[in-house]
Amino acid sequence: MNTDVRIEKDFLGEKEIPKDAYYGVQTIRATENFPITGYRIHPELIKSLGIVKKSAALANMEVGLLDKEVGQYIVKAADEVIEGKWNDQFIVDPIQGGAGTSINMNANEVIANRALELMGEEKGNYSKISPNSHVNMSQSTNDAFPTATHIAVLSLLNQLIETTKYMQQEFMKKADEFAGVIKMGRTHLQDAVPILLGQEFEAYARVIARDIERIANTRNNLYDINMGATAVGTGLNADPEYISIVTEHLAKFSGHPLRSAQHLVDATQNTDCYTEVSSALKVCMINMSKIANDLRLMASGPRAGLSEIVLPARQPGSSIMPGKVNPVMPEVMNQVAFQVFGNDLTITSASEAGQFELNVMEPVLFFNLIQSISIMTNVFKSFTENCLKGIKANEERMKEYVEKSIGIITAINPHVGYETAAKLAREAYLTGESIRELCIKYGVLTEEQLNEILNPYEMTHPGIAGRK
């Protein structure tokens, strides 16, 4: 007989479980059925599952459904899960069939077996403390798993919001630093009219501020939880008093202003609150990818590109070209954006795929949503510290572009008319002569007038340059 294992059984039969393991037979079945991604459950979701199980045990004790001795051991075991002590025991793949039953049962089994151990009983002695009858009392996967995900997503969103605020503030600092730096504005990747580098960076900061607000606003619908809905939202096997009490405990232990959804069937059927979050994340990454593209273009060179800004050198850029340095931080921002776009499509498809009283595709939906939030938080932290803070302006190069640009003819347009200005611009392009030289050559404007009109700083705010 193998003494390194214990035997657990369910209505499908028996399974060998490693003797030291806190998970049980249903977790083992899940690992056999779903070796899909190679990933484990996110630590924040494990913590949230602990909060759900602790809150449920306390509420069930308060309404007289759960034996107090059993309940106290469940609470102690759940506290250890919340602390992250047993993260290594959560071994199921996050993408799975069954609407999250395997994740829920992984939590139930770990908490039950640890509670048994604390009680002085052998793991697997479910006649004393059962994963289903005790740890999962008054619950279904269909309310426990989404509620845990709401808590995890809210916690991760708060981290993302703080990180994004920090990045936004650093963009504003750069806007102030570059407030007097003149450069050429571009439309269609062609020279347009002068702009201040600080104006560009402030525009970046402002769009990020809107993203912060958009993301923050999505939290409101996540505060509505369906705990107590049980299987289909009707609350079967959940005492009405339990629903109220468990919601209070969940709000207390999670630190979020959670409330019971007004209509539990609606809250169990529908997943629009997650697609709303994902949409806000996608919009944010659309904006961040655009900013990353701008930075890569401005930093192109250093000799044969724009070379308007200098990004911090983070690592050698080529295994064959000595001395080459690449814009790796904007590049990783682009790649995170692409991942978030793909995740959003998955979330959209999964959200649409629900039928009747439950969306069974929630595991892939939650996996992608949590991944999007996590990788955005990570990339914003790294980008801010390793790139944004160290960006330098190549002021001489930008000034040279402005002075050589034909785009400044736009400022002359109100003084000489569009047709004359267009002829001057065309000749400047063909001959290489400057706009200033051609204006003097043809007597279109005087030197004094040109000094006022062609002051590039006068072109960076509303008004007609040279008109007092």
Swiss-Prot record:
The keyword Signal does not apply. CDD domains: Aspartase. Changing residue 188 to A: 100-fold decrease in catalytic efficiency. Does not result in any major conformational changes. Keywords: Lyase. The keyword DNA-binding does not apply. It catalyses: L-aspartate = fumarate + NH4(+). GO terms for biological process: aspartate metabolic process; tricarboxylic acid cycle. L-aspartate binds at residues 101, 140-142, 187-188, 319, 324. Gene3D superfamilies: Fumarase/aspartase (C-terminal domain), Fumarase/aspartase (Central domain), Fumarase/aspartase (N-terminal domain). Changing residue 141 to K: 40000-fold decrease in catalytic efficiency. Changing residue 141 to V/R: Loss of activity. Unlike E.coli aspartase, the enzyme is not activated by the presence of divalent metal ions at alkaline pH. InterPro entries: ApsA, Aspartate_Ammonia-Lyase, Fumarase/histidase_N, Fumarase_C_C, Fumarate_lyase_CS, Fumarate_lyase_fam, Fumarate_lyase_N, L-Aspartase-like. GO terms for molecular function: aspartate ammonia-lyase activity. Optimum temperature is 65 degrees Celsius at pH 7.5. Thermostable. Retains 80% of its activity after a 60 minutes incubation at 55 degrees Celsius. Changing residue 140 to K/R: Loss of activity. Optimum pH is 8.5 at 30 degrees Celsius and 7.5 at 60 degrees Celsius. Free AspB is very stable between pH 6 and 9, keeping over 80% of activity after 24 hours, and much less stable at pH 5 and 10. Changing residue 188 to K/Q/R: Loss of activity. Each subunit is composed of three domains: the N-terminal large domain, the central helix domain and the C-terminal small domain. Substrate binding induces a large conformational change in the SS loop from an open conformation to one that closes over the active site. The C-terminal domain is essential for activity. The small C-terminal domain could play an important role in controlling the conformation of the SS loop and, therefore, in regulating the catalytic activity. Catalyzes the reversible conversion of L-aspartate to fumarate and ammonia. Is highly specific for L-aspartate in the deamination reaction, and cannot use alternative substrates such as D-aspartic acid, alpha-methyl-DL-aspartic acid, beta-methyl-DL-aspartic acid or L-glutamate. In the reverse reaction, alternative nucleophiles (such as hydroxylamine, hydrazine, methoxylamine and methylamine) can replace ammonia in vitro, leading to the formation of N-substituted aspartic acid derivatives. This is Aspartate ammonia-lyase. It comes from Bacillus sp.
